[in-house]
Amino acid sequence: MTLAVEAHDDAAPTVRLAAAAQPSSLAAYEKKPVEFWPTAAIRLAVESGELEVWKRIVVALKRDPYGRTARQVEEVLETVSSYGIGKALTEVLSRSRAELEADERAEVARQIHALIDRSGLSGREFASRIGVSGDDLAAFLAADVSPSAAQMVRMRRLSDRFAKMKAQRTARPE
């Protein structure tokens, strides 16, 4: 959009808004998802000041806060001087990542609950057999922290072993 001032002899100057003669530099990308834009287009979008484009970037960041677009935005924000949008996008990334990490801890907690249930062991016995304290297991189950990958493997193996023993006991006629 361009702004033009028209001056007339008898009247005060008037301001006329005219459509820009050139299409937006982002026009080539408008129909593509933001996730498929090159970094140069992300940079242009951040610098352009177009709210609708920023909204699309925010949606992409929330959808995948560690994905390609997030990395591109981080790269652009290192060099761009758009403080307002830069601060906002940084905040979106930070919050989206925190929410994702909380969701992942909750998912791990659900998996641990299922492993304990499947094993037939009490929580205390399960914790003892995987080599953690009851408090540590409680922290895993509350999604406060996540166990290491090695601990998850140990939990799955323990659950498998006790589930197999439980199945064999119920399969035997007494």
Question: What residue ranges belong to the model's regions?
Answer:
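A short, Lys/Arg-rich alpha-helix, primarily the initiator
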Residues: T90-R118
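Recognition helix of helix-turn-helix/homeodomain-like DNA-binding domains
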Residues: G131-P147
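Short alpha-helical "recognition helix" segments of helix-turn-helix
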Residues: S122-S128, L137
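DNA major-groove recognition helix of helix-turn-helix/homeodomain DNA-binding modules
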Residues: E91, R95, P147-R169
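Alpha-helix N-cap/N′ positions at the starts of helices
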Residues: V34-P38, G49-V53, E104-V108, R118, ...
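Interaction interfaces in information-processing and related assembly proteins
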Residues: R56-A98
